[in-house]
Design a protein with these regions (language model features):
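Short, structured helix-loop boundary elements
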Residues: 24, 45, 67, 71, ...
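N-terminal intrinsically disordered/low-complexity leader segments
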Residues: 1-22, 89-93, 185, 214-234
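Solvent-exposed, amphipathic alpha-helical segments
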Residues: 30-38, 80-91, 175-182
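Helix-loop "lid/cap" segments that line or gate small-molecule binding pockets
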Residues: 110-114, 155, 205-209
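Hydrophobic/aromatic-rich alpha-helical bundle segments in the mid-to-C-terminal region
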Residues: 124, 128, 133-137, 141, ...
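Generic hydrophobic, amphipathic alpha-helix propensity
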Residues: 23-32, 73-77, 81, 85, ...
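Hydrophobic alpha-helical connector segments
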Residues: 72, 86-121, 132, 169-172
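Helix-turn-helix
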Residues: 26, 30, 34-68, 72
Length: 234
């Protein structure tokens, strides 16, 4: 099926032919680009349609309403985030398997925060649509699956306590969510070297409850406890 723009009363739309699936993807890509700059409010189908060279009527064949498109953009953000977490945890191997396991979860947590630093408007769109949308929630759950897989590997390596469930680790999630919120809502500057160090040390401190004695040893040797507690005000 090929769809094309048509002339409208508001003005002529430059015709551009799309295969059925391609038009849907083009709409999502343009909506995502707008959300990354200005957030959810920038996702307006009647403005997107002429920008990509089709009529609003053609665009609405793919999305019954604006909210469906917003949810696609939010879900796509979680797909991107899962990809970033996966990339962040592919690091250089270290001789200590306990430290390697610790670093893997540390880097994954930092990747989640860094996404909000890099993409604050997109991250806001994701969070604001997480509750009401089953589609968005399903994609968001992929983050939990990825992090739990990391935890399971860490349990096998002896870094994390047996039976740790990532969803139940409130101190670590409080750190991840709190730091992400500061970034996405512009509460504090997050791009400075000092902010980066404090972010990493906050994650280190809030991982404490997950760790075995060996995990604590590896953490404190690689990321000295004196530095962690000093920044935390301990």
């Amino acid at each position: 099926m090929v769809e094309a723009g048509i002339a409208t009363a508001e003005g002529a739309v430059k015709k551009k032919a799309y295969h059925h699936g391609d038009l849907r993807n083009a709409i999502i890509q343009e909506a995502t680009a707008r959300a990354r700059v200005s957030g959810e409010k920038a996702i307006i189908l009647r403005e997107i349609a002429p920008h990509i060279g089709v009529s609003a009527t053609a665009a609405y064949r793919h999305f019954a309403n604006r909210q469906q498109l917003v949810e696609e953009v939010a879900a796509g953000g979680f797909v991107e985030l899962v990809g970033r977490v996966a990339v962040a945890t592919v690091g250089g191997a270290v001789s200590d398997p306990v430290l390697s396991a610790y670093r893997e979860l540390r880097e994954a947590a930092l990747a989640v925060v860094e996404f909000s630093i890099d993409e604050p408007a997109w991250a806001r769109t994701m969070m604001e649509n997480l509750g009401p949308s089953e589609t968005v929630a399903a994609h968001a759950d992929a983050i939990n699956v990825e992090l739990q897989a990391i935890v399971e590997r860490g349990i096998e390596a002896g870094a994390f306590r047996p039976g740790v469930v990532m969803n139940d680790e409130l101190p670590l999630w409080a750190a991840i969510d709190g730091l992400s919120a500061q970034a996405m809502f512009g509460i504090r500057p997050m791009r400075t070297p000092d902010a980066a160090r404090s972010t990493a040390r906050t994650i280190d401190l809030c991982m404490t409850d997950l760790l075995t004695d060996e995990g604590l040893r590896a953490r404190d040797e690689a990321f000295p406890a004196a530095d962690i507690t000093a920044d935390a005000g301990v």
